[in-house]
Amino acid sequence: MCMTNDSRNYFQKRPNTHEPTLGPGISFMNQRSNNKTQRLQQWFDERPRWDHASYGEFMHIGANQTIFRIALEEQEISTETKVLDTACAVGGNARWMASLFGCQVWGNDIDEEALVVARDLAEIENISELCTFVEAPVEALPFDDNTFNIVVTTDVFDSNEVKRVLKPGGSFIVISLFEDPKITPVQLAERWGLELETSLDVTDLAFAFNRAKETEARLLHESDLIGARELIDIMNKSVAPYTNGGRHYIMRLRKK
């Protein structure tokens, strides 16, 4: 299992000591909104990590639409394509692909609260019939062998399970930080038993993005929206892996 960027920290529940709001005089109370932006804001108001909020529904440098479009370059996707977004959180990638291509998508995660949000957002976007979100760990996917044409992930996955559920000739698209500076995409492909089709080093972009998160965290701290401990936590985990030599790769691999 790859879990390289401490990407599970946002699943630690923060006590909800205040009523979720968008601003002065604007309150959601405790009711779920049928507005996409408001529903996401409700979710982020309950999260312990403010640094994830400005990622929006994609929650990760490797899961924004620009980067994801690069990863999908030359990928043939139709309404018949079956896609798994493993460790999907609120399902940003899965829902985006369903909306754009009309394909059937599945997402798995261990956080049922995140999956509730994913289902709510799929309903708001009128794509519920294309999306299925299930509670399951990456190392025990509840799917048959050779099920999916495409598996996508950002950081958290189990390579053996990915290979098992992929159809022969299917694609595994991974966008992830690898903290070992000596490891290469070719070596990773060999380790996972997959054929490397393409790779792109996006470390500079990821570093700049996470540096911006540090600046944002300082502004939040100055505005008394986060405490000193949270600020230090964000600063320690944003760019440190990159300054220590970590590399961020986009890779597309194929099951032989």
Predicted regions and their residues:
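Conserved class I S-adenosyl-L-methionine
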Residues: S7-E76
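Class I SAM-dependent methyltransferase SAM/SAH-binding core
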Residues: L84, G92-E139
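A short glycine-rich, Lys/Arg-flanked "PGG" loop and its adjoining helix->strand segment in the class I
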Residues: S159-S171
